[in-house]
Amino acid sequence: MLIIEGISSSYDQVRVLSGVSLNVKEGEVLGLLGRNGAGKSTLLKSIMGLVKIDEGTIKLDDVVLNQKLAHEIPECGIGYIPQGRRLFPELMVEENLKMGLYARNSSNEVLEWALSLFPVLKTRLKQKSG
């Protein structure tokens, strides 16, 4: 079960999430609806560890996900594919690629092989141009 308890998050002193709590049971499907800027993407990115939360707790079963990249927690079993095929500049190229693998429950053997051939994949996206 995914348990979110009282999470809050801010960007540049602007509160984006304030005291968000919800429980999602295994097998349950949840849709997030809201206007632009309501915090839907921030909530999803918070669950994935891509956005820092200021307070509260995010747990999947007994694993606390706060401030961790979800794809680095094997027992987590969740992935996130951003709309519009966006990448995350704060992550390494390798981590961006792994996001898609975890979302599809795919093996990362091919990715590990590619990473061994191209060391540039171990650098952060924001260090790249073009």
Label every model-predicted segment:
Residues 30-31, 80:
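Short beta-strand immediately N-terminal to the Walker A/P-loop
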Residues 12, 68-70, 93-109, 119-122, ...:
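ABC-type ATPase nucleotide-binding domains, specifically the catalytic core motifs of the NBD
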Residues 64-85, 111, 125-129:
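ABC ATPase NBD coupling module
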Residues 48:
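Helix-to-loop junction immediately C-terminal to a conserved catalytic motif
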Residues 57-59, 63-64:
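ATP-binding/catalytic-site motifs of ATP-hydrolyzing domains
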Residues 2-4, 17:
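Conserved structural motif at the start of ABC-family nucleotide-binding domains
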Residues 33-35:
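The feature captures the beta-strand-to-loop junction immediately N-terminal to the Walker
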